[in-house]
Amino acid sequence: NSAFNYISPTYLVDLPSKGVFYPGGHPLNGKTTVELREMTAKEEDILFNKSFLERGIVLEKLLQSLFVDKSIDPASLLVIDKNALLFAARINGYGPEYPIKANCPACLSQFDSVVDLNTLLKIREKEKKDGVILLSNGLLSVTLPVTKWVVVIKPLSGADQDNLQKILETKKKNNIDQNSLIENIRSYVVSINGVIDGTSIYEAITNMPARDSKLLRNVYSDCFPNITTTSQVVCTVCRETADLEVPFTISFFWSK
């Protein structure tokens, strides 16, 4: 036996989704918490892995290593849960202090500030709306006011979000109109009047009356739980107070 045996402690992280929006058979269906291991030098190696960084999968690999339950696929995590888990891992591994460079909207100066991650993450609970039905598989069904189409929507997973980003980047690279609003709606629409064909759904969204489109976006925004990462900072130059959206990137784990 080595004199340096060390068993990493574990801790529980609350899921903002409360496991409600995962389909039956998913390891997080109905689960309100996930157990993570404490970060070690092994996880730091993952954060600096050049191959993972180039492929854009470093955060998924980090969570995969930290999960006690290895049956959980990080790519299948809802974005809200994924971000909450990464926040918890960052605080557990490096503490809650997060140094940032902020731009003052009043005097336009750039200044250094420190954000307390314990107070940064704010979870907005899902709302109940008339006419919106929670289906047994974690999806939502809503009837649109103008067309009367019955639309089924899902909360985005990390894989869905990555796929949306790739679609928009490919369109931009090929000088194709990005239609970002349409693509964004398309990313969370599962079916319209029972039709699941992607081309048909895209066409329907493109021609959807503005009133229907607005309601659909509001239902997605309000009826699924969401996370905000806004912090109030004070400019060190002019002393003006501003609300700043803290960017969530890999540098989140690299700050000194």
Regions picked out by a protein language model, each given a short descriptive name:
Residues 1-256:
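Long C-terminal interaction/binding lobes of large macromolecular proteins
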